[in-house]
Amino acid sequence: MKIKTRFAPSPTGYLHVGGARTALYSWLFARNHGGEFVLRIEDTDLERSTPEAIEAIMDGMNWLNLEWDEGPYYQTKRFDRYNAVIDQMLEEGTAYKCYCSKERLEALREEQMAKGEKPRYDGRCRHSHEHHADDEPCVVRFANPQEGSVVFDDQIRGPIEFSNQELDDLIIRRTDGSPTYNFCVVVDDWDMEITHVIRGEDHINNTPRQINILKALKAPVPVYAHVSMINGDDGKKLSKRHGAVSVMQYRDDGYLPEALLNYLVRLGWSHGDQEIFTREEMIKYFALNAVSKSASAFNTDKLLWLNHHYINALPPEYVATHLQWHIEQENIDTRNGPQLADLVKLLGERCKTLKEMAQSCRYFYEDFAEFDADAAKKHLRPVARQPLEVVRDKLTAITDWTAENVHHAIQATADELEVGMGKVGMPLRVAVTGAGQSPALDVTVHAIGKTRSIERINKALAFIAERENQQ
């Protein structure tokens, strides 16, 4: 049997991390078994579904590189199929037309609640032999079995049982002729030959209804696995107030897809004590029986730690392809300065996100208008004039511009003036970067370039001279 899973989001908003984790688990399970992964857009909610949301879901899936083998299928393009199946069920007697008014149903609901009963349809039209005109408005209900129970072996939670007496006669077609969500899902899983349904725990109560419809259609019943919810670090359900919850927001905030995937796979699944997983390792080791039943707590600090790891562990050339987008957001012209892959090597240890890297690299490519006020006040003082003049001359004399030779020039300046490296290094750092912090000074000066570094030292010397004149 070929394993076939699906990810079936509703396009009413962005792809959030809970949905992304569900997609990842479904994708990994299919890949682990050499199966296929289907993308299905469940857009039956015509009022809330938007093209923008569909695009956002696709963007998120593509950014995470969760490629699908089939689809995307759209439920709104399959209404003829759903209605054909409903008509077949009406003929076979597994569904029936219900003409009860909203007023009657509301009165029934209030009466049941007043008695402390669970609100449910009383089956009036199921047993009715009244004649109705063909054009009289009605819904179609599934004739749910009234005896026995539904039992399914959830691959994460174990056996789950529902009494059929607890289940309503579900509406499967509305008065406007449109099929309902729970019914469309059943027909889709049947037609697309889905073998394993991996989805959020909020769908557990839908499962017995869907199984009963599948059995009425004499269709195979897939295996189900319901993943627990994700909470914020305060124990409450993850929401916007916990920070970014959209996958693409994490992209915008400077996270790598590898970091988010690694974090999400461990958010409820484990393989021993291993924390870092390549995509290949995730596929190799993933198993549903290792997924936790308990809710997981989202920890942004842990995600940040993973992101920092991947910035430094992945090939700089690859990280640079993701950094490019952030550079563009900052409107930095990188034509004059180090290659982005070299920038990743320079700033990788200091920066935990690519956004932070893009925001702290401008001095490598563009001249700055003024020095950081605090750094200049502390380090661009008259006492720094001589170290800057000497190191400028030694840098000017370099014929082979390498980081090693830059280091020698700085060291030689300190030796000649008989001062510590800090007496040379700190004024030089502020002079060439405009700030008080940077990567190692030799590689920083080397990356900025000889001509630009010397010009900036001269600018710093002019700043010191002006400062002296004002005193």
UniProtKB/Swiss-Prot annotation:
Binds 1 zinc ion per subunit. The gene is gltX. This is Glutamate--tRNA ligase. It comes from Escherichia coli O6:K15:H31 (strain 536 / UPEC). Keywords: Aminoacyl-tRNA synthetase, ATP-binding, Cytoplasm, Ligase, Metal-binding, Nucleotide-binding, Protein biosynthesis, Zinc. It holds the Pfam family tRNA-synt_1c. Monomer. NCBIfam families: gltX_bact. It is found in: Cytoplasm. The keyword Nucleotide-binding applies. Its cofactor is Zn(2+). It is an enzyme of class 6 (ligase). GO terms for biological process: glutamyl-tRNA aminoacylation. Zn(2+) binds at residues 98, 100, 125, 127. Catalyzes the attachment of glutamate to tRNA(Glu) in a two-step reaction: glutamate is first activated by ATP to form Glu-AMP and then transferred to the acceptor end of tRNA(Glu).
